[in-house]
Regions:
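Hydrophobic faces of well-ordered beta-strands that scaffold small-molecule active sites
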Residues: 35-43, 63-66, 88-92, 117-119, ...
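Catalytic domains of carbohydrate-active enzymes, especially glycoside hydrolases
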Residues: 50-71, 108-113
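N-terminal amphipathic alpha-helix/helix-capping segment at the start of soluble metabolic enzymes
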Residues: 2-48, 77
Length: 148
């Protein structure tokens, strides 16, 4: 039985950047070769890790991961979500911020339109479970060591 070789057809996509937006940040083209992950029917191949709203508005990433080393505040999540043209994953706790506070922040982030919430290590497993039970969006947990 002979195997048929599949050739990948190269697509030409028209592109327009405009004069004022020609200085936006572009991710490397090789990102398009990644498989990515599909969440709620949207395929995400790239994440920009930033809380800078100017970068959020001027980068061609498929999603934004907005995590910062301070106590999460709904007003910051709302500002980033309202500026972004793409899905946003917002930080809702870890370390100092945990328990019911992280749970309420996650619920509020979901109501604000976040695509997912992020918990930074260290975070107790029971808090992760509690948040997962209360929201219907992805819960991402950072891992810093094999034992966590």
């Amino acid at each position: 039985m002979s195997q048929q070789l599949k050739t990948k057809m190269v697509k030409t996509v028209p592109s327009y950047t405009g004069t004022l937006r020609s200085h936006s940040l572009s991710l490397p083209h090789c990102v398009s070769e990644c498989s990515g992950i599909r969440i709620f029917g949207k395929r995400i191949k790239s994440l920009a890790f930033t809380t800078d709203v100017a970068i959020v508005k001027n980068i061609n990433a498929d999603a934004i991961m907005a995590v910062y080393p301070f106590t999460p505040q709904p007003v910051i999540a709302d500002a980033i979500i309202s500026v972004a043209d793409v899905p946003v994953f917002v930080g809702v706790g870890g370390g100092v911020t945990s328990g019911m506070r992280s749970d309420r922040l996650a619920i509020q982030a979901e109501h604000q339109g976040a695509f997912g919430v992020v918990l930074n290590a260290p975070i107790p497993n029971d808090v992760v479970r509690m948040i997962k039970e209360d929201v219907d969006i992805p819960v991402v947990v950072t891992v810093v060591a094999e034992s966590t």
